[in-house]
């Protein structure tokens, strides 16, 4: 189930607005953790466009979930790139 802010009577619009906030926060956090600024903002903008094109609540939630997964993966990649060779080898060995 989605989180329905009480600001609007339109559930889909409220969820879209909430998703936009989530995408912005994810982009900012990703940049703080080392993701390329341009890539973070372009991804955010693409997710917002996809979010606006969604016509049902499940579609909006799917776009939001895909954004969360995308930024989580990108943050993970960024973190692994900054590991020392020894730590990288250990992470690869244990399969993280």
Identify the residue ranges that each predicted region occupies:
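Inter-domain helical "communication" segments and dimerization helices
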Residues: 1-95
